[in-house]
């Protein structure tokens, strides 16, 4: 919403009311001190120019009470008496409909075509390649008349305002006719215009360049992004040709703006004050990008300064609720230093509370998102740790189960071997007589047929050691087998003989015990397989270690045939591992 300032008062007008006021000023040329009375006069006549002009020229219009009941807005107090405004966005009912600023297309440099190419005038915002109208030409002309009148009136008013601005900036010392610089019909510079050419040898340009808010090479879209995401003010400055050596083409107005206003110490002091909440975009309209920006904003003459920010704005009166949009907060006055600073200060102070609230909400939103992300990451990490623990627990349980299964299989294989060992074998033919002595001092003698393999001898001795029975009495073997089965049934580290304990307790013969052992082997899906020996047989004189060879019979070993003596020596775990590695 346009704001008109006059001394200690400010008037919030709609765009239509501002146009009416401008037309009234062009017609009557009233002095600036009559502005409050003129606004009151127009309000009392419903902003109708004809009755207001009639009353104005009658001469009896000053001091008239405000019949529309609209109070005059007082200006923002100075810093000494400034009361902190209430933080928060403006009420919805009073949210203005401000002009919206949009970024340039990302590929505007490629899509832009110089005016006059192929006989057409195109811009990057062209929606159609061509336009044709096949209707009545008279109706088409009628459609264009309102737009032509509006453009002409705006052009005439801008012309007069520019004359007044130039006269005020130059201080009235130049009696020559002021020259008004217009935005060119097409950009005249294809390359980037350096800042040194724009500022030239202007005094205090180094102080201006030291501002954190000013980045000479920043693009328009990047400046808009910063203003939008960080809720900063964007000071958009569009100037003309200030660097040309030809005095006929140089934009004197823009040059005076830079020297007298923008680089003035008071301006620099205020810009430093709001440096953290500001982004400055200073470009020359003879370059492509600022030229397109000027076309978007409807800038016809240079210089122009706009203040842009991401505020609550209604794009149209049909919207019930405003939304955050990059909007033009105001076009700053450039006809004098004091008016420029006053207009800039008023707009900044007006919208600063809203931007502060928006920035705080944005910070809180980012913090909440970061906290939520940290919580989600912690939750995912906790789930991952639980999953790893579950996997480790499952592996541990499986490992323990595998150990139990291996131990059970080892016990069942030895029980099966004991059942086979107690079975009678043929005693015909030659036999080897071997005497055994265990590490505990037990001695016993056994006879083996000549075709008995060394592995079978190991198995036979292993059964005696496993049951701790050193005779061939079937009754002793049966009792030892029953005791062993009962021990395994009561052992929690073993998986066998957990069911059918009554059947196990009543079995007394070797055949019954063999049937029970075979059932356990079948239930665990185990085959006979090789036995694991934790001892070795050694012939002492001469010392010779007998290995459990399945392909060598006892009659092939001179130390054992026909008679021999063997020591049963227990193997340590390290010796067993060495033997396994040698076999591999």
Curated annotation (Swiss-Prot):
Residue ranges occupied by any UBX domain in the UniProt entry: 426-570
Topological domains, Cytoplasmic: 1-80, 173-584
Classification via InterPro entries: UBX_dom, UBX_domain-protein
Keyword Membrane: yes
GO cellular component: Doa10p ubiquitin ligase complex; endoplasmic reticulum; endoplasmic reticulum membrane; Hrd1p ubiquitin ligase complex; Hrd1p ubiquitin ligase ERAD-L complex; lipid droplet; mitochondrial outer membrane; plasma membrane
GO MF assignments: protein-macromolecule adaptor activity; ubiquitin binding
Keyword Membrane among record annotations: yes
Superkingdom of origin: Eukaryota
Subcellular location: Endoplasmic reticulum membrane
Sequence ranges on the Lumenal membrane side: 102-151
Keywords, ordered alphabetically: Endoplasmic reticulum, Membrane, Transmembrane, Transmembrane helix, Ubl conjugation pathway
Other remarks on this protein: Present with 12600 molecules/cell in log phase SD medium.
PANTHER family, sorted: FAS-ASSOCIATED FACTOR 2, FAS-ASSOCIATED PROTEIN
Quaternary structure note: Component of the DOA10 ubiquitin ligase complex which contains E3 ligase SSM4/DOA10 and CDC48-binding protein UBX2/SEL1. Component of the HRD1 ubiquitin ligase complex which contains the E3 ligase HRD1, its cofactors HRD3, USA1 and DER1, substrate recruiting factor YOS9 and UBX2. In ERAD-L, HRD3 and YOS9 jointly bind misfolded glycoproteins in the endoplasmic reticulum (ER) lumen.
Function: Integral endoplasmic reticulum membrane protein that coordinates the assembly of the ER-associated protein degradation (ERAD) machinery at the ER membrane. Mediates binding of CDC48 to the E3 ubiquitin ligases SSM4/DOA10 and HRD1, and to ERAD substrates. Component of the DOA10 ubiquitin ligase complex, which is part of the ERAD-C pathway responsible for the rapid degradation of membrane proteins with misfolded cytoplasmic domains. ERAD-C substrates are ubiquitinated through DOA10 in conjunction with the E2 ubiquitin-conjugating enzymes UBC6 and UBC7-CUE1.
Name of the featured protein: UBX domain-containing protein 2
Native species: Saccharomyces cerevisiae (strain ATCC 204508 / S288c)
Upper classification of the organism: Eukaryota, Fungi, Dikarya, Ascomycota, Saccharomycotina
This protein's encoding gene: UBX2
């Amino acid at each position: 919403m346009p704001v008109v300032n006059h001394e200690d008062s400010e008037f919030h007008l709609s765009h239509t009311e501002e146009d009416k006021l401008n037309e009234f000023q062009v017609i009557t040329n009233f002095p600036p001190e009559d502005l409050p009375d003129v606004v009151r006069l127009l309000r009392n006549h419903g902003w109708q120019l004809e009755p207001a002009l009639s009353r104005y020229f009658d001469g009896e219009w000053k001091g008239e009470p405000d019949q529309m009941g609209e109070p005059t807005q007082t200006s923002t107090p100075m810093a000494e008496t400034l009361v902190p405004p209430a933080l928060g966005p403006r009420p919805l009912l009073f949210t203005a409909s401000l002009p919206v600023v949009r970024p340039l297309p990302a590929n505007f440099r490629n899509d832009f075509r110089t005016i006059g190419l192929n006989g057409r005038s195109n811009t990057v915002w062209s929606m159609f390649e061509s336009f044709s109208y096949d209707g009545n030409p008279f109706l088409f002309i009628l459609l264009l008349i309102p737009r032509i009148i509006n453009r002409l009136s705006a052009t005439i008013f801008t012309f007069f305002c520019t004359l007044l601005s130039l006269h005020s900036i130059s201080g009235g010392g130049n009696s020559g006719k002021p020259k008004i610089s217009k935005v060119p019909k097409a950009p005249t510079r294809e390359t980037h215009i350096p800042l040194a050419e724009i500022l030239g040898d202007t005094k205090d340009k180094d102080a201006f360049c030291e501002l954190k808010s000013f980045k000479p090479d920043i693009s328009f879209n990047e400046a808009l992004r910063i203003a939008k995401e960080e809720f900063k003010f964007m000071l958009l400055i569009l100037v003309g040709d200030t660097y040309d050596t030809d005095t006929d083409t140089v934009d004197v107005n823009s040059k005076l703006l830079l020297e007298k206003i923008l680089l003035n110490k008071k301006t620099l002091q205020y810009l430093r004050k709001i440096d953290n909440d500001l982004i400055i975009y200073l470009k020359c309209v003879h370059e492509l990008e600022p030229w397109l920006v000027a076309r978007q904003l409807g800038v016809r003459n240079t210089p122009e300064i706009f203040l842009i920010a991401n505020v609550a704005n209604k794009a149209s009166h049909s919207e019930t609720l405003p939304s955050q949009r990059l909007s033009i907060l105001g076009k700053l006055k450039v006809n004098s230093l004091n008016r420029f600073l006053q207009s800039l200060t008023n707009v900044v102070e007006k919208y600063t509370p809203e931007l502060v609230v928006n920035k705080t909400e944005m910070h809180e939103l980012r913090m909440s998102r970061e906290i939520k992300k940290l919580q989600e990451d912690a939750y995912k990490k906790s789930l991952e740790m639980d999953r790893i623990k579950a996997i480790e627990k499952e592996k541990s349980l499986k490992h323990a189960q595998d150990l139990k299964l291996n131990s059970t299989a080892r016990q069942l294989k030895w029980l099966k071997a004991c059942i086979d060992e107690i079975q009678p074998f043929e005693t015909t033919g030659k036999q080897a007589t071997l005497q055994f002595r265990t590490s505990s001092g037990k001695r016993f003698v056994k006879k083996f047929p000549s075709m008995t393999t060394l592995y079978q001898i190991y198995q036979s001795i292993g059964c005696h050691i496993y049951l701790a029975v050193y005779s061939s009495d079937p009754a002793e073997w049966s009792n030892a087998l029953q005791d062993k089965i009962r021990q395994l049934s009561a052992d929690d580290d073993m998986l066998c003989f957990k069911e059918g304990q009554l059947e196990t307790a009543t079995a007394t013969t070797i055949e019954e015990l063999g049937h029970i052992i075979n059932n356990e082997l079948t239930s665990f899906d185990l085959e006979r397989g090789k036995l694991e020996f934790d001892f070795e047989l050694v012939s002492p004189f001469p010392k010779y270690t007998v290995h459990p060879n399945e392909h060598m019979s006892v009659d092939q070993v001179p130390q054992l045939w026909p008679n021999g003596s063997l020591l049963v020596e227990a193997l340590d775990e390290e010796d067993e591992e060495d033997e396994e590695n040698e076999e591999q």
